[in-house]
Amino acid sequence: MNENDFVVGVLTYITCLREKKRYSTAKSYQDALRSFKCFCGREEIPYAYINRDTLLRYQSWLLAKGCARNTVSTSMRRIRHIYNLAVEVGEAAYIPHLFKNVFTGVESKRKKALPSESLRLLMTSPVTDPQQKRTQSAFCLMFLFSGMAFVDLAHLRKEDIKEGILSYYRQKSGSLIQVEIPAEAQGLLNELAADTTEDSPYLFPFLE
């Protein structure tokens, strides 16, 4: 297999991640590679094959399969990282704004937007009642996790979080979602998870 090949680049990077025991991140790259190879229909993918048109078609392919935009973003960011590494060592050509027209951000899917002041009050108002405090913490986490639905929050399992990455399947569509856990969510996550019984498979206590 040619060294100037995207597949080689990903596999090499996955090996480095595993050596550093970053297994969850390595799996994320493995999933992105498997998906992109399936789309391309080939085992070898020269870096020259990756252009704006290919990326746009890949994005359309993912969306047509029912993938959420945040999942599309994760795949695109994985491809972008490997491509940029190849550019640095001269294995791939530098193409300005190569990923400009594909989604690489984080989308918050709130069907009805709250006024910013109302949102601030919901998230920061002092609460003394334990049940209300739990509800407030859940709301904050749903917001910080890119607008996660409560049913998905309730069904999160303990093994869904590894190395700062949250991976779960949406209850509604079955789509795989992967998001990096923001620093401001960690305290809330630990606080809410502390109420879960040790033998429960779920991360939070809502289904107990």
Residues covered by each model-derived region:
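N-terminal helical hairpins
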Residues: 1-3, 19
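N-terminal core-binding DNA-recognition domain of tyrosine recombinases/integrases
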Residues: 11-24, 33-110, 125
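Conserved helix-loop functional segments at active or binding sites
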Residues: 61-64, 88, 121-128, 159, ...
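Basic, Lys/Arg- and aromatic-enriched nucleic-acid-binding interface segment
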Residues: 94-150, 154
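Short linear capping/connector segments at secondary-structure termini
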Residues: 98-105, 171, 204-208
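Conserved tyrosine-mediated DNA breakage-rejoining catalytic core shared by Y-recombinases
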Residues: 155-191
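Short, leucine-enriched amphipathic alpha-helices that occur as contiguous helical runs
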Residues: 29, 75, 134-137
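Major-groove DNA-contacting interfaces characterized by cationic-aromatic clusters
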Residues: 189-208
